[in-house]
C-alpha cells in the first residue's frame, strides 16, 4: 500500500471562511478517491492568508479598543490550524459518508520543533500583520518584536523563518497514519516551538510549509510526496518566449537548475528544495509538483513535474 503525503497551498483555501468551505471540497474529494483506491493519505496545508486574517483582526481590534488583549503570532497560527482543520475534516467526513467508506479522518494541531540557535532568528525577514504609519506606532503595537519599513507602505512586524527539525507527537502521527486513517497535519508548517531548559515554548515565526511537510513525509516513511500549486508543471525560463516545462528531473539536474537561478526564491524554489529534501532521504522516493485540481492525473504520471533520485 503506497503512502502519499500531499501538500496544499494556503492560497488554495481562499481568503475567508466562506470561500474556504467551498474550496476544501476539491481536496476532500481527491483525497478520498485515492483512499478508495487503496493509498494511504496524509494531507498538509498552508495557512498564509488565514493566519494573516486572524492576526490582523486582533491587531485592528486593539487599535479600536486598547483593552483588547494582544494575541501572539504563534497563537494566531494555531487558531488558523483549528478552523482550517474544522473545514477540512467536515468536507472529508462528508465525502467518506458519500462514498460509504469506514475510514476515520483526524487532524493534528502541529507544533514543529526548531532550534533556538537557528540563524534565522537573528535575521527575521517575513512580514506579518498590519501596516503602521510610524516606527513608534509599530513598535508600540508589537512589543519585543522586530519592525521594518516595508517598501514605502509603512512599518510592519517581521518574524523569522527557521528550519524545521522535528514535530511534537510525530510517533502518534505516524501510528495513526499506519492504521489507515486519513491524517491532516503540518498546517502552515506548524507552530514554531523551541525546547528550553524548563520545557517547550512556542515562538513567533513562519516555517516553510512544504519543507516541514517533506520532513513529516520522511518521518512517516512515505513513498510519494506531492506539492499541489497553481501551475501544471515546473518551468525553466518561466514567462519568457523560450519557456520550457519539466516533466521529470533527477536531483542532480534540479540542483544545476537551482544554481542557475531558474526557480523564483519566493515561489518555486522552496518547493523544489522541499522535494529534494524528501527524494534524497532514501531509495525509491519520488516527489511531484503539480496543479491543485490534477492530483489523480499527477499520480498517474500524466501531468506535473516528477523529481527522482
From Swiss-Prot:
GO terms for cellular component: cytosol. NCBIfam families: PRK12352.1. Residues 125-144 are annotated as: Disordered. PANTHER family: CARBAMATE KINASE, CARBAMATE KINASE-RELATED. Keywords: Kinase, Transferase. It comes from the Bacteria. Belongs to the carbamate kinase family. One of its GO terms (biological process) is arginine deiminase pathway. The keyword Transferase applies. This is Carbamate kinase-like protein. One of its GO terms (molecular function) is carbamate kinase activity. The lineage of its organism: Bacteria, Bacillati, Mycoplasmatota, Mycoplasmoidales, Mycoplasmoidaceae. CDD domains: AAK_CK. It holds the Pfam family AA_kinase.
Amino acid at each position: 500500500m503506497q503512502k502519499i503525503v500531499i501538500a496544499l497551498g494556503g492560497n488554495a483555501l481562499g481568503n475567508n471562511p466562506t470561500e474556504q468551505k467551498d474550496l476544501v471540497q476539491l481536496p476532500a474529494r481527491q483525497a478520498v478517491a485515492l483512499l478508495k483506491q487503496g493509498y494511504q493519505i496524509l494531507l498538509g496545508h498552508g495557512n498564509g492568508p488565514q493566519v494573516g486574517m486572524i492576526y490582523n483582526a486582533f491587531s485592528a481590534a486593539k487599535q479600536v479598543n486598547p483593552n483588547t488583549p494582544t494575541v501572539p503570532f504563534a497563537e494566531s497560527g494555531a487558531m488558523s490550524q483549528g478552523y482550517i482543520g474544522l473545514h477540512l475534516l467536515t468536507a472529508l467526513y462528508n465525502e467518506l459518508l458519500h462514498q460509504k467508506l469506514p475510514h476515520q479522518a483526524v487532524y493534528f494541531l502541529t507544533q514543529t520543533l526548531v532550534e533556538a540557535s537557528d540563524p534565522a532568528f537573528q535575521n527575521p525577514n517575513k512580514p506579518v500583520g498590519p501596516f503602521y504609519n510610524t516606527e513608534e506606532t509599530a513598535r508600540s503595537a508589537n512589543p519585543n518584536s522586530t519592525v521594518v519599513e516595508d517598501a514605502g507602505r509603512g512599518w510592519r512586524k517581521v518574524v523569522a523563518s527557521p528550519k524545521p527539525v522535528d514535530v511534537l507527537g510525530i510517533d502518534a502521527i505516524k501510528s495513526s497514519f499506519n492504521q489507515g486513517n486519513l491524517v491532516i497535519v503540518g498546517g502552515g508548517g506548524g507552530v514554531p516551538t523551541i525546547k528550553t531548559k524548563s520545557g517547550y515554548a512556542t515562538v513567533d515565526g513562519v516555517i516553510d510549509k512544504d519543507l516541514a511537510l517533506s520532513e513529516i513525509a520522511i518521518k512517516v516513511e512515505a513513498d510519494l510526496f506531492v506539492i499541489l500549486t497553481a501551475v501544471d508543471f515546473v518551468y525553466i525560463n518561466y514567462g519568457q518566449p523560450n519557456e520550457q516545462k519539466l516533466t521529470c528531473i533527477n536531483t542532480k539536474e534540479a540542483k544545476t537548475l537551482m544554481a542557475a537561478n531558474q526557480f523564483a526564491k519566493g515561489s518555486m524554489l522552496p518547493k523544489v528544495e522541499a522535494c529534494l529534501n524528501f527524494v534524497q532521504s532514501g531509495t525509491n522516493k519520488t516527489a511531484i509538483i503539480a496543479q491543485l485540481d490534477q492530483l489523480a492525473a499527477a499520480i498517474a504520471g500524466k501531468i506535473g513535474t516528477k523529481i527522482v533520485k
